[in-house]
Amino acid sequence: MEVKVSMENSEAGYKSVSIYSNSGIILEEVTDRTNLREACKTVQKNRGAPGIDGVTVLEYACMRETKGYKELSQIIDAGKYRPKPVKRVYIPKANGDKRPLGIPTVEDRVVQQAIANVLSDFYDEKFSDNSFGYRPNRGCRDAIRRAIKYANEGREWIIDLDLSKFFDTVNHSKLLQVLSKDIKDGRVISLIHRFLRAPVSENGKVSEKTKLGTPQGGPMSPILANIILNECDEMMDKAGIKFVRYADDMMIFCTSKKAAERTLNRVTKFLEDKLFLKVNKEKTKILNYSKGTQFLGFSLTKRVPKHIKETCPRCTIYVTVH
């Protein structure tokens, strides 16, 4: 099936091309009214505060029940949808710092969720088996089980890798380049780009269009994070590097300290040179399980009873929840 993209869309900033159903995601999948309706249900379920327009989730859902989704679908299809500025708030962190959180309007959240639904369906089978964050039927406990498995196989030297302000520093051009490898419909890429560049509203002042990052708080951010970090996952899988990743939290498992040092250099070079991300060298650590470590809110501890230390060089890795 061929889908024609009109010159009107081209004038709105989209490429005038012919899109085929075998070319990956097409815009009509995003704007399908059933998908938009399901996206609205997800936003309702997640609740959340109003964006800069003050419209609540309940108010928006009631309005859509009355008006339906035809008009919204047509606006997006015509290339005329424009995201509103994202409302910025700050959430306290355990260490006393504050984490910036972006609150899009409810309608923008619905459209983002519609995009995320389609991206997730398309990309999930492409993701590494060692990736656990924001994926169907996977969670923290699955990530911990995989970490325990790798450690019990003798890979007890661990790289606890920290990406510096990951969500705020994702390079838009690189992300769009990665997306374009699989998505040939320029209309989809342009719509995602508009959301990435949406201005930020803070204390009543609206900034210029955003140049970096996928603000935490938008439904698209988790899947976009997985898509760009899957580039590094693929490199590690091909190299036989054992790792566990949950969104931007990553642990890499090695058999010796020297191997861990070499692997850290290789992974850091890829993340910084290929994906234009920044590894936080102060927080990134190489450690041994014998001293215990934290991952995703769990304590991973190697317990060796004194009377078997000499006869049992390996032991079970235990996990306790905090």
Say what each PLM segment does.
Residues 86, 105-109, 121:
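Acidic, glycine-rich two-metal-ion catalytic cores of nucleic acid-processing enzymes
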Residues 68-71, 75-90, 94, 126-292:
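Conserved polymerase palm-domain catalytic core
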Residues 39-43, 114, 191-196:
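Short alpha-helical scaffolding segments that buttress acidic/His motifs in well-ordered protein cores
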Residues 107, 111, 116, 176:
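Duplex nucleic acid-engaging cores and interfaces of nucleic-acid transaction enzymes
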